[in-house]
Design a protein with these regions (language model features):
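Long C-terminal interaction/binding lobes of large macromolecular proteins
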Residues: 1-239
């Protein structure tokens, strides 16, 4: 006689990028094992890959393509899944900024972690000669490829590639050039042809795009000085 299946609770949350409500469940023991092994590796690429795999299993709403979600949706979704699975708080060690070495333990409640939005953030960026570029958010795959390279030179190259593949279109009052009709090589060459000032405008899109964030204050036990700590992005919450 087979063992009975125990039902799993279902929850809802709203995706920050589009306001869509989705259903999800906590992760199971087999999925927790995947995460533990990734965390023990201390390899950020393995951590993010594990997050992707677990989210695919835990998202119950049909039609949600995890690989196409913006990275900040992925991060927010994972934190909430984790909260319903193993606890509503995260234990971290943070480094005090006043001396750059003293570590202090802190507890962060998952409900206190928000996706911050910058008022100056825009996906439409004016360049020159009447041309503008419309950007799209990097997918999780692009996010992994760009952020978790161990080779500094390779990281620079992948950063350019992520910027190029995040272009949606280039346009002016009369014409529109869709990035989907261009090769990766053509897009990279176009990015490399920009002036430094134009490139900085595009970089601003990534610097101001929504991100997981939480600000806390700690006191350095050695210097007695108060420190403001800002946590940003998924990996900061597994430091």
């Amino acid at each position: 006689m087979p063992l009975p299946k125990i039902s799993t609770a279902e929850y809802e949350l709203t995706l920050p990028s589009n306001g869509k409500t989705i259903k999800y469940r906590p992760f199971l023991v087999r999925e927790e094992k995947i995460l533990i092994l990734a965390l023990e590796s201390e390899n950020q690429k393995q951590i993010t890959t594990a997050v992707r795999q677990v989210i695919k299993e835990c998202v119950l709403t049909k039609g949600i393509k995890v690989d196409q979600l913006p990275s900040f949706d992925i991060e927010y979704l994972f934190l909430n899944i984790r909260g319903k699975s193993v606890g509503e708080s995260i234990e971290l060690m943070v480094t005090c900024g006043d001396d750059g070495k003293t570590e202090v333990p802190v507890t962060v409640l998952i409900d206190d972690i928000e996706v911050s939005n910058d008022d100056e953030h825009s996906s439409d960026i004016e360049l020159s000669d009447g041309y503008s570029v419309k950007m799209k958010y990097p997918s999780l795959n692009q996010f992994i490829e760009t952020n978790f390279s161990q080779d500094d030179e390779d990281a620079v190259e992948k950063s350019f590639e992520m910027i190029a593949t995040s272009i949606d279109m280039v346009y002016n009052d009369k014409d529109m050039f869709a990035a989907s009709e261009c090769t990766k090589k053509e897009l990279k060459e176009w990015v490399e042809s920009l002036t430094s000032a134009q490139f900085q405008k595009i970089e601003q899109f990534f610097e101001t795009m929504p991100k997981l964030t939480h600000t806390l204050e700690v006191v350095n036990p050695n210097t007695k000085k108060k420190n403001t700590i800002v946590l940003e992005g998924l990996t900061d919450f597994f430091a």
